[in-house]
């Protein structure tokens, strides 16, 4: 990460991050043992990986973008430190989101920063970041959906550049989601194949729940699957409890942004954990492809 946050402090990065966390805790309710243990775990990983400056940078960026209503998306919702800093409204302890999904000692790259701004505020956000951090280039991500990134090194960026740490931050503009459905249509699947093949993402076989999926789809004759059947799939394939299904239902109704974001991350993690085969997860492509070819365009597809 090459952005230089304008922070007024003399202590080292990790000490300053600890101080900011303690400051956020003052005046609040006493921490539970579970909360203390989670903070200790996250700070231990942050210290071992020497990434405190990244979290300070995220905090600094958000302080500048609050005026345009920006929020952070992505795996940041798995971090209790980010929650304490006010960077996300999602309490990962409430939703059972593991920090290891956001960052761990085995990761070779830094977590990517997804900044989402309300419709019509993208240019304001780009201007603020350009002026604040003296960035000279704003690059569209090749094959991206209205995504922009900052780089003083490259004239254009690819997805691969993100994983080479040439990417500073995504800036995305909120898109209106008009359609909620689960599709099993072959035509939709072919479109998904084309979509991912353009990004060199393989849809090869790497799942462990084929028989369960096939049984569910044979019972529905391969027709569209609606919400109640989706919860049944979650319970049967992923072992999701009734309580968790209720959280899914609330989140998918778009009643709360933080619920929706947290459930996405839980779902994403659970699939990885169970080996059910999450192939890709793209916020503004509105596409999930999970398990077998049968479950397609899961959760968000804008059909306009």
Question: For each predicted feature, which ranges?
Answer:
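Alpha-helical scaffold/interaction cores of sigma-54-like transcription cofactors
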Residues: 1-304
């Amino acid at each position: 990460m090459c952005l230089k946050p304008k922070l007024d402090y003399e202590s080292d990065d990790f000490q300053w991050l600890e101080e900011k966390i303690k400051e956020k805790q003052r005046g609040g309710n006493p921490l539970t043992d579970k909360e203390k243990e989670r903070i200790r775990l996250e700070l231990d990983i942050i210290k071992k990986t020497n990434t405190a400056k990244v979290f300070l940078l995220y905090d600094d960026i958000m302080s500048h973008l609050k005026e345009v209503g920006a929020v952070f998306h992505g795996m940041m919702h798995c971090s209790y430190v980010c929650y304490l800093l006010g960077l996300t409204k999602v309490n990962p302890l409430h939703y059972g989101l593991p920090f290891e999904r956001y960052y761990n000692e085995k990761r070779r790259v830094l977590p990517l920063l997804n900044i989402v701004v309300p419709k019509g505020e993208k240019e304001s956000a780009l201007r603020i970041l350009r002026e604040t951090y003296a960035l000279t280039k704003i690059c569209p991500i090749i094959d991206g959906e209205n995504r922009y990134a900052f780089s003083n090194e490259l004239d254009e960026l690819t997805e691969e550049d993100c994983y080479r740490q040439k990417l500073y931050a995504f800036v995305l503009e909120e898109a209106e989601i008009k359609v909620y459905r689960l599709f099993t249509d072959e035509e939709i699947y072919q479109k998904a194949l084309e979509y991912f093949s353009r990004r060199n993402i393989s849809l090869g076989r790497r799942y462990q729940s084929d028989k369960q999926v096939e049984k569910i789809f044979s019972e529905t004759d391969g027709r569209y699957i609606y919400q109640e059947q989706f919860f049944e799939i979650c319970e049967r394939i992923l072992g999701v409890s009734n309580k968790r299904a209720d959280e899914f239902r609330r989140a998918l109704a778009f009643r709360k942004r933080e619920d929706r974001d947290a459930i996405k991350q839980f779902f994403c993690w659970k699939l990885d954990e169970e080996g059910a085969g999450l192939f890709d997860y793209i916020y503004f492509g509105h596409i999930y492809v999970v398990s077998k070819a049968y479950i397609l365009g899961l959760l968000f597809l804008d059909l306009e």
